[in-house]
């Protein structure tokens, strides 16, 4: 199964994270399929940069986000776009 999760980058006591698509059997910092953005929790306010189109594409393909990534993607507005796409597909099927 393919997951969307965080991989830790940065140096000791100064982490930042990449949001990546990875096979769930891989290690946390192992090889990943594609990078979707990054998250820096240390900055005030935090920095969140997500390629929304890529994230939507992977979610529609069936990639499962971790709970933390799900919360971050919700803040970035990814799930609103996914819902819109699913609604338009249902309307097209019904007509």
Swiss-Prot record:
The keyword Ribosomal protein applies. It comes from the Bacteria. GO terms for biological process: translation. One of its GO terms (molecular function) is structural constituent of ribosome. SUPFAM superfamilies: Ribosomal protein S16. Disulfide bonds: none annotated. The keyword Cell inner membrane does not apply. GO terms for cellular component: cytoplasm; small ribosomal subunit. Keywords: Ribonucleoprotein, Ribosomal protein. Belongs to the bacterial ribosomal protein bS16 family. HAMAP family: Ribosomal_bS16. NCBIfam families: S16. PANTHER family: 30S RIBOSOMAL PROTEIN S16, SMALL RIBOSOMAL SUBUNIT PROTEIN BS16M. This is Small ribosomal subunit protein bS16.
